[in-house]
């Protein structure tokens, strides 16, 4: 019966916040370099905050009512990485609040950074005991230590904590460099990813571009050599993603496609930063086409997600008994 089913949204749904707020930040920056209103950027940021609030409420409610289901997600070799999206999006929301209400931004950042560090220490260090299955090695492994530390650096830059931002940036960069060879080796040589996991490949687009965005946040926005090199590697990853489109589009659209969104939105922001540094040249030429392209991708994701919501296919409901501990099923 429908009454026996309860809302069960996996932590991966926080990925919707990543791309939405990331594009909001891109439009905020666009309003500084172009004669466009800041309201579009602020509107996307507010939309992302609302989505984050709803998802956070659902996640906390599930944690309180069905802690066993959250524990199962945290212990899952693949899904556990996506749980780290909760502190990641909390820190992005903190960045969104910086121009409006700094004390709240500091509180959200403080909470998010403590949670992300604690979870990364528990989850990632736990993988070092040699029991992580090879088939569970996917780009999702970037999330706890790479994405979260880059976002921490971005938040530090927005709040003016430059030295702390550099520390987090270093943690993210070296985590990225240590993980990428392992992940690429698995993708190349250890069997094809199952269809349901192929959209996790979208995360592969993010590290270089989010690292570039984090570096620009802590270096005062200077489009220096390092920023351009990171951007270049991000563009190369974009070409790889385009090449593999038929492969990961072999499944119907679902919320997991938002894994591409944070890298895409970071492409927009970093492209604008580098392009606004001059009135001509390579980056100036790329800035507008890339900005249009990224807006097109995010718009498609928003429209398709809204369609899923209207069709009743977005909000996952699960039998109550499945979410309860075995001893509580009676």
Swiss-Prot record:
Positions in the Cytoplasmic compartment: 1-7, 60-79, 128-138, 190-194, 249-254, 311-330
Membrane topology: Multi-pass membrane protein
Keywords: Antibiotic resistance, Cell inner membrane, Cell membrane, Ion channel, Ion transport, Membrane, Tellurium resistance, Transmembrane, Transmembrane helix, Transport
GO molecular function, one term: monoatomic cation efflux transmembrane transporter activity
Main location: membrane
Protein's cellular compartments: Cell inner membrane
Subunit composition and interactions: Homotrimer. Each subunit forms a channel.
Family statement drawn from the similarity comment of this UniProt entry: Belongs to the tellurite-resistance/dicarboxylate transporter (TDT) family.
Protein name per its UniProtKB record: Tellurite resistance protein TehA
Its job: Responsible for potassium tellurite resistance when present in high copy number. Ion channel involved in potassium tellurite resistance. Otherwise, phenotypically silent.
Cell inner membrane recorded as keyword: yes
Single GO BP term: response to antibiotic
Organism: Escherichia coli (strain K12)
Residues in the Periplasmic compartment per record: 29-35, 99-101, 160-161, 219-224, 276-283
Residues with site note (Important for gating): 262
Recorded GO CC terms: plasma membrane
Transmembrane segments: 8-28, 36-59, 80-98, 102-127, 139-159, 162-189, 195-218, 225-248, 255-275, 284-310
């Amino acid at each position: 019966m429908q009454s026996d089913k309860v809302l069960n949204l996996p932590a991966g749904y926080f990925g919707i916040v990543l791309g939405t707020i990331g594009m909001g930040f891109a439009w905020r920056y666009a309003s500084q370099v172009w004669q466009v209103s800041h309201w579009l950027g602020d509107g996307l940021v507010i939309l992302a905050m609302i989505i984050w609030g709803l998802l956070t409420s659902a996640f906390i409610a599930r944690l309180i009512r069905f802690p066993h289901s959250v524990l199962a997600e945290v212990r899952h070799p693949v899904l556990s990485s996506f749980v780290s999206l909760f502190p990641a999006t909390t820190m992005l929301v903190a960045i969104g609040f910086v121009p409006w209400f700094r004390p709240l931004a500091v509180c959200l950042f403080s909470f998010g950074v403590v949670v992300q560090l604690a979870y990364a220490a528990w989850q990632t260090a736990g993988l070092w005991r040699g029991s992580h299955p090879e088939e569970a090695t996917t780009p999702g492994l970037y999330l706890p230590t790479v994405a979260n530390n880059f976002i921490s650096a971005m938040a530090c830059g927005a709040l003016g904590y430059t030295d702390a931002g550099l520390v987090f940036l270093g943690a993210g960069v070296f985590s990225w460099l240590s993980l990428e060879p392992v992940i690429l080796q698995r993708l190349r040589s250890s069997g094809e990813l199952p269809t349901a996991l192929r959209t996790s490949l979208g995360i592969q687009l993010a590290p270089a571009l989010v690292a570039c965005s984090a570096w620009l946040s802590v270096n005062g926005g200077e489009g220096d050599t390092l920023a351009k090199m990171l951007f270049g590697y991000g563009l190369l990853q974009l070409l790889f993603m385009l090449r593999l489109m038929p492969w990961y589009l072999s499944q119907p659209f679902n919320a997991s496609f938002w894994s591409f969104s944070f890298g895409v939105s970071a492409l927009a922001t970093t492209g604008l930063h580098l392009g606004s540094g001059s009135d001509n040249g390579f980056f100036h030429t790329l800035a507008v086409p890339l900005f249009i392209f990224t807006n097109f991708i995010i718009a498609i994701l928003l429209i398709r997600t809204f369609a899923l919501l209207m069709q009743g296919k977005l909000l996952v409901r699960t039998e109550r008994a499945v979410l309860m501990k075995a001893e509580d099923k009676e």
